[in-house]
């Protein structure tokens, strides 16, 4: 075939540039979508301590958060009838990634029980949504509540001893109660509903670890209105023994035995360090297990006064170690460890039967370190009894125990020198003075009679 001189085939550059343009646009859109300036995550609106009830006098904090910064926010408040009582719109030019402010209060006074709704919106500086940014809207509905709970003490123990216990019966009136506790100034105690609605009974302890005692009933409602009512109870400052114990080399045998049993792989630089670890760290671990077992219980309505019999778990026993003893251990004239003795040591014959003085339920049956084989028996109203250094368990975890039943036998497990029982009483996990709970007269005057007085007043008020 003959070739025609001067002919040249045309190239379609137009189509090529169209494809190239579309690819470029696609890449631009993709990279823009992945870019921080086009991020699509909406701002976060956090309202602190917001419930269904609100006291305008309390400050409610709002936190606005966004990774691309907050551009603007608005707050609109309307009443139940649709009336607008607040309308705020703000542009935030300094571009904070976190903005804190307080929920604004309408200028007009709102009546008790009024319904108010807030709509809070926040928009960020992102260029997404056609450069308008991402917006979050949050709605809050409140009932106005400015009245604090009312507290009235019905009956209480006249006095409390350092290390001892007291019973308080009171009335707390509030339809929207969020928190109700009784405090000794340090620890908090859960009240038990007693007889009728709004009435409560609580045993409170003054542990030896606390040098002061301030009995307070603290009630807080859903709008965070709070009442702190101080109960008038006479404080008796009973002293406890302060013991200095000088250790000799022969005293470390039991420590070596416990360390080998409890922490066989742990290395100690000295006998003093080993003694301190066993006496303080292992003791702390034991007492946490005891606290957990004796402070977790069902809070049920008490339908009649609780009658406690005096506790005396070991018949014919002698006391060989007192409660509240502050012990300071010295080795070669150096103080190496300190601890409190939070029970009563009682000795009788070897493997003596341990008797439950009051009915209860076994909530702990465990081999501990310092305390050895241990039972905790829960009796109700936050009261538990402790039995340690046991040789033989006679009952099992979860068993319901009747008054007078044998639950175990005394022994020398744990850190015990000779067969004896370490006996303790706890009020909601706090060790208390044994002499009170082993005294029938004290129980009658400080527990039983207070229950009965409270019952009489409550039933009279219901008529």
Language-model features: locations:
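Proline/serine/threonine-rich low-complexity linkers at boundaries of modular beta-sandwich domains
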Residues: 26-46, 132-150
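Short edge beta-strand/loop segments characteristic of extracellular beta-sandwich folds
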Residues: 59-66, 156, 164-173
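Non-catalytic extracellular/periplasmic "stalk"
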Residues: 165-167, 178-322
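Short beta-strand segments of immunoglobulin-like
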Residues: 48-53, 155-161
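Catalytic cores of peptidoglycan-degrading enzymes
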Residues: 308-457
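Short, solvent-exposed loop/turn segments at the edges of extracellular beta-sandwich modules
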Residues: 123-131, 221-225
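Aromatic sugar-binding surface patches on proteins
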Residues: 93-106, 196-203
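N-terminal Lys/Arg-rich, disordered targeting/topogenic segments
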Residues: 1-13
């Amino acid at each position: 075939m003959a070739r025609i001189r001067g002919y040249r085939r045309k190239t379609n550059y137009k189509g090529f540039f169209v494809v190239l343009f579309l690819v470029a646009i696609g890449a631009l859109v993709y990279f823009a979508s992945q870019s921080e300036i086009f991020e699509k995550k909406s701002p976060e609106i956090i309202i602190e301590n917001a419930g269904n009830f609100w006291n305008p006098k309390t400050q409610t904090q709002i936190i606005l958060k966004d990774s691309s910064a907050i551009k603007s926010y608005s707050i609109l408040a309307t009443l139940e009838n649709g009336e607008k009582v607040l309308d705020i719109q703000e542009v935030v030019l300094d571009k904070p990634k976190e903005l804190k402010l307080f929920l604004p209060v309408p200028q007009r006074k709102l009546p008790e029980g009024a319904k108010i709704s807030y709509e809070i919106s926040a928009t960020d500086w992102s260029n997404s949504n056609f450069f308008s940014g991402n917006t979050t809207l949050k709605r809050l509905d409140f009932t106005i509540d400015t009245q604090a709970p009312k507290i009235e003490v019905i009956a209480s123990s006249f006095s409390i001893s350092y290390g001892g216990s007291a019973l308080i019966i009171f009335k707390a009136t509030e339809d929207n109660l969020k928190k109700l506790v009784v405090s000794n100034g340090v620890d908090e105690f859960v009240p038990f509903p007693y007889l009728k609605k709004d009435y409560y009974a609580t045993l409170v302890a003054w542990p030896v670890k606390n040098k002061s005692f301030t009995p307070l009933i603290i009630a807080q409602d859903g709008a965070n209105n709070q009442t702190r009512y101080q109960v008038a109870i006479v404080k008796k400052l009973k002293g406890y023994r302060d013991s200095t114990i000088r250790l000799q080399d022969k005293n470390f045998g039991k420590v070596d035995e416990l360390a080998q049993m409890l922490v066989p792989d742990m290395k100690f630089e000295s006998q003093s360090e080993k003694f301190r670890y066993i006496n303080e760290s292992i003791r702390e671990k034991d007492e946490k297990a005891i606290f957990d077992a004796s402070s977790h219980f069902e809070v049920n309505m008490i339908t009649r006064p609780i009658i406690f019999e005096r506790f005396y778990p070991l018949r014919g026993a002698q006391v060989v170690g007192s409660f509240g003893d502050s012990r300071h251990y010295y080795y070669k004239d150096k103080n190496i460890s300190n601890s409190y003795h939070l029970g009563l040591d009682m000795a009788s014959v070897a493997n003596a039967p341990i008797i439950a003085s009051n009915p209860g339920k076994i909530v702990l049956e465990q081999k501990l370190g310092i305390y050895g084989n241990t039972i905790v028996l829960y009796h109700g109203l936050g009261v538990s009894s402790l039995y340690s250094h046991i040789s033989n368990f006679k009952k099992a975890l979860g068993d319901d125990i009747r008054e007078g039943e044998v639950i175990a036998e005394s022994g020398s497990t744990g850190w015990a020198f000779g067969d004896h029982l370490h006996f303790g009483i706890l009020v909601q996990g706090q060790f208390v003075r044994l002499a009170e709970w082993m005294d029938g007269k004290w129980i009658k005057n400080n527990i039983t009679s207070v229950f009965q007085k409270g019952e009489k007043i409550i039933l009279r008020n219901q008529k």
